[in-house]
Amino acid sequence: MTLAAAAGASAAAVPSHLQTFLGLDFGTKRTGVAFASRMLGSARPLSTVRTSQSDARLAQVRVHVQEWQPEALVVGIPFHPDGAEHENTLRARKFARSLRGRFSMPVFEVDERYSTTEARSEGARDADASAACIILEQFLRGLA
């Protein structure tokens, strides 16, 4: 799915049979993980994967996929405030592509500007997992 479609995800863009999602707030050293249910319309932070190694990060994501059995993955894609791409935009997209190659489920990309900032401003104990939760909640709102 393209970013433009994901940013304003609609029921038409995301098939209604997809009900559960694992959200990922990608970072080069930490990746936040959260789970959401379309039926409940809510998300919950799970944990943060702490590694800078791509294979180790993907292995930890696999553990979460096996445990939570999501029907799709949602990856936050960072942008500058003006919408311009930067180095981490490309890294997050590469991460999303690697997820598509490893897991037999849809992977959606969502504009995640300010999610970590919002999580920190809310006093989250685990800002990365909370940012993943915010990304999923934004995604779910787009489906309504």
Residue ranges, per PLM feature:
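Phosphate- and other anionic-substrate recognition elements at nucleic-acid/protein interfaces
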Residues: 1-24, 28-144
